[in-house]
Amino acid sequence: MSWQDKIAQGLQRRRDAAAYRTRQVNEGANGRWLQSGERQYLNFSSNDYLGLSQNDEVIAAWQQGARRYGVGSGGSGHVTGYSQPHARLEQQLADWLGYPRALLFISGYAANQAVLTALTDADDRILADKLSHASLLEAAAHSPAQLRRFQHNQPEALQNLLIKPCQGQTLVVTEGVFSMDGDSAPLAALQQQTSAAGGWLLVDDAHGIGVHGEEGRGSCWLQGVQPELLVVTFGKAFGLSGAAVLCQEPVAEYLLQYARHLIYSTAMPPAQACALQAALRQVQQGDALRQQLQQRIRQFRTAAAHLPLQLGASKTAIQPLLVGDNQQSLIWAEQLRAAGLWVTAIRPPTVPPGSARLRITLSAAHQPEDIDRLLEVLYGLCH
């Protein structure tokens, strides 16, 4: 088989399964609206949970940072790319979340890959929730450690793995809020079991940070848990991009020595770190935005419970409506788009086979009438 045949067959498999991914060009998007071509859509596919991507103070901080520091960092943080804005942001994050250290990464994907591959050796094991993000599962699979997955959000399933012998160290991996189902992990139970077995817990709280807890401190704070490793990302509630790993001092120093994604990647622009400091202030002061988001979630769930579709058991901004069939999910997504609503159909392999869905995400930027319009069109599709 030639390279051309290999590529052609791989593409055809996705088409045959109604799982072919495409990108849509848009002219601008935020928590509420998306502009594509000549049309404006109500945006129910964004992770901009607090609407901060268009916040005036955040934008001004980026602009001021760019004028002061330029538009790029100029190198790895180990060479010339680590500036005062980076150091200040790391300290502010550590103080806010109650850890000695924070390390910045260019993305949550990079952070997860770096931590799992740098910390583990061949005699270690990684025990991961089956529905953990692709970045976690891929990093675990590529790490030298043995990977075992436990049933989603089932502490007893984790316990069955923890009691098995391991020559090295155990790292348990989960998410605070799961990106496709919107449900939350039982973090207190997972941490208790992990600690009792002498292991460490890593929580990726990409979809919980900024949204849950006092000052938006996230899922771990809400559940009274401090994992050994906390990954927070800035592409959701913060309205920007990038990530940070929160940990103890020796762990941070170890990652600085061994985390290749830190050592060999250009650091985020200092201007971005300036904008993230402004976004952090907005998150900390964002109780009104979080309350507004919760109101939109309750409004949607109360009415969506009467739809003839399976509504996920989510109390978060991620509200999946299970369709099952790949093609049907695409048809409904197109019909919603024709009605001026941007809703994304999520299909395997992103989610398990037979669980194609409309993944609806809500934002504090949405207005009550936006939710009413979405529900009106959904009712029309189902009846």
Swiss-Prot record:
Substrate binds at R21, H133, T350. Gene3D superfamilies: Aspartate Aminotransferase, domain 1 (3.90.1150.10), Type I PLP-dependent aspartate aminotransferase-like (Major domain) (3.40.640.10). The keyword Transferase applies. Transmembrane segments: none annotated. SUPFAM superfamilies: PLP-dependent transferases. The modification N6-(pyridoxal phosphate)lysine is found at K236. The keyword Methyltransferase does not apply. Its cofactor is pyridoxal 5'-phosphate. Its EC number is 2.3.1.47. Pathway: Cofactor biosynthesis; biotin biosynthesis. One of its GO terms (biological process) is biotin biosynthetic process. It catalyses: 6-carboxyhexanoyl-[ACP] + L-alanine + H(+) = (8S)-8-amino-7-oxononanoate + holo-[ACP] + CO2. One of its GO terms (molecular function) is pyridoxal phosphate binding. Pyridoxal 5'-phosphate binds at G108, Y109, S179, H207, T233. Keywords: Biotin biosynthesis, Pyridoxal phosphate, Transferase. Homodimer. Belongs to the class-II pyridoxal-phosphate-dependent aminotransferase family. BioF subfamily. Catalyzes the decarboxylative condensation of pimeloyl-[acyl-carrier protein] and L-alanine to produce 8-amino-7-oxononanoate (AON), [acyl-carrier protein], and carbon dioxide. HAMAP family: BioF_aminotrans_2. This is 8-amino-7-oxononanoate synthase. It comes from Yersinia pseudotuberculosis serotype IB (strain PB1/+). The gene is bioF.
